Amino acid sequence: MKRMIALDGAQGEGGGQILRSALSLSMITGQPFTITGIRAGRAKPGLLRQHLTAVKAAAEICRATVEGAELGSQRLVFRPGTVRGGDYRFAIGSAGSCTLVLQTVLPALWFADGPSRVEVSGGTDNPSAPPADFIRRVLEPLLAKIGVHQQTTLLRHGFYPAGGGVVATEVSPVASFNSLQLGERGNIVQMRGEVLLAGVPRHVAEREIATLAGSFSLHEQNIHNLPRDQGPGNTVSLEVESENITERFFVVGEKRVSAEVVAAQLVKEVKRYLASPAAVGEYLADQLVLPMALAGTGEFTVAHPSCHLLTNIAVVERFLPVRFGLIETDGVTRVSIE
């Protein structure tokens, strides 16, 4: 019998990432875990619908036995079984992030006995989670270099707080993992601005694009009007394609916040990324830790290692026989498998 791993949910950033990473790793390694103080660092601690959906999805995919899987629970015991490929559908029942649920279960399906399709309904444009286009255009091309073949499709947008969005991913078992080397970003090839609108006046998008164009030379400017019943909602994104990597940044519009202020937030974030020669942005860095650990080799550079990143590394090191090294030089941190 494999040993039970005990995790403190208040560790590091004290959010849901600890739980999501633990679920992924438990499914992959077969190691059971118990976690207490779930989301202790949040205003509403314990399991929300999004986290509960991730737990139930993980349990279904590997036939796990679970204790504490209920809304508001701050303690969970997860004993995994065998991961099975198949066609899965999960509903969050709120505007909780579809992509974070997918992020939890897809790594385990890399080790399944056959191809899988996972469909999740809930929120697709959430201010605290990566949108589907980030997964599709940024993360998945990098995963392909590592040897992971999955394809995400956004079937319907769902903005906060209404939700109602649908995201699906098709994934195949991984034959072998390759080393990912992302030390240098390289020169910028082009930048693309994009705005999504659903039930929001078009002039909002035009003002957001104008704000982006006032700070960057945009090779493309796209405005997409979605059906009104998928809103109301507004997301503005800026994609930076460089020689070695494509990064994508986004801000979700809010009520009573002007288009100019929303776009200015995005401008600030992109300028912070471009001010450093590091290849990887803060959000992407979190998502590369697990696949890199499974490969057992690789490295990337990031300007500032976030609390999210450090917490994720700590959880991975509890489940897998790997150690990460972080070396800071001239304001750039190189993250690698030692």
Curated annotation (Swiss-Prot):
Gene3D superfamilies, per database record: RNA 3'-terminal phosphate cyclase domain, RNA 3'-terminal phosphate cyclase, insert domain
Primary localisation category: cytoplasm
Keywords: ATP-binding, Cytoplasm, Ligase, Nucleotide-binding
GO annotation, biological process: RNA processing
Pfam family, one: RTC_insert
A GO-annotated cellular component: cytoplasm
Descriptive protein name: RNA 3'-terminal phosphate cyclase
Main function: Catalyzes the conversion of 3'-phosphate to a 2',3'-cyclic phosphodiester at the end of RNA. The mechanism of action of the enzyme occurs in 3 steps: (A) adenylation of the enzyme by ATP; (B) transfer of adenylate to an RNA-N3'P to produce RNA-N3'PP5'A; (C) and attack of the adjacent 2'-hydroxyl on the 3'-phosphorus in the diester linkage to produce the cyclic end product. The biological role of this enzyme is unknown but it is likely to function in some aspects of cellular RNA processing.
Subcellular location: Cytoplasm
One MF annotation (Gene Ontology) recorded for this entry: RNA-3'-phosphate cyclase activity
Ligand binding (ATP): 103, 283-287
Family stated for the protein in its record: Belongs to the RNA 3'-terminal cyclase family. Type 1 subfamily.
PANTHER family per the UniProt record, alphabetical: RNA 3' TERMINAL PHOSPHATE CYCLASE (PTHR11096), RNA 3'-TERMINAL PHOSPHATE CYCLASE (PTHR11096:SF0)
Catalytic activity line of the entry: a 3'-end 3'-phospho-ribonucleotide-RNA + ATP = a 3'-end 2',3'-cyclophospho-ribonucleotide-RNA + AMP + diphosphate
Active-site residue numbers: 308
Taxonomy of the source species: Bacteria, Pseudomonadati, Pseudomonadota, Gammaproteobacteria, Enterobacterales
Provenance organism: Escherichia coli O1:K1 / APEC
EC number: 6.5.1.4
